[in-house]
Curated annotation (Swiss-Prot):
Pfam families tied to this protein: SufE
InterPro entries the UniProt entry points to: Fe-S_metab-assoc_dom
SUPFAM superfamilies: SufE/NifU (SSF82649)
Tree of life domain: Bacteria
Organism in which the protein naturally occurs: Haemophilus influenzae (strain ATCC 51907 / DSM 11121 / KW20 / Rd)
Family: Belongs to the SufE family.
Protein name from the UniProt record: Uncharacterized SufE-like protein HI_1293
């Protein structure tokens, strides 16, 4: 998916890929949503959860009411799931989505939601 996004010729192609990716993100049950942390400041409601694993890596889950955000979450989780705190400390969510040609086309509120997730990733290393 990453290479497809990088090679997309225009925003419309990227947008279709993002929406398609979001279909892979399962909708959590109400109980699962209740266990996730709400992300404030985004255009649509969004939830995020960090789950530490026994091997010192992390697994992430989340959901949004907006299809585009679900696609972005799915793309993000495929990039960061299974990483250690040290690996996550060097990951820059802003650079990641910028290199994919996505950040430039998102609203400030959507970027704010992603940046809050990025801050939570950095907080894992404190």
């Amino acid at each position: 998916m990453i290479e497809q996004l990088k090679q997309a010729k225009n925003w419309e192609d990227r947008y279709r890929l993002i929406i398609q990716a979001g279909k892979n993100l399962p909708r959590p049950s109400d109980n699962e949503l209740a266990q996730m942390q709400p992300i404030t400041g985004c255009e649509a409601q969004m939830w995020f959860q960090i789950m530490p694993k026994n091997d010192r890596t992390f697994q992430f889950s989340g959901f949004s009411e907006a299809r585009i955000m679900n696609g972005l979450l799915w793309i993000l989780f495929n990039q960061i799931n299974g990483k250690t705190a040290d690996e996550l400390n060097t990951f820059d969510i802003t650079v990641f989505f910028s290199e994919l040609g996505i950040s430039q086309r998102l609203s400030e509120m959507r970027l704010n939601g992603l940046n809050q997730i990025g801050q939570q990733l950095k907080n894992l290393c404190i």
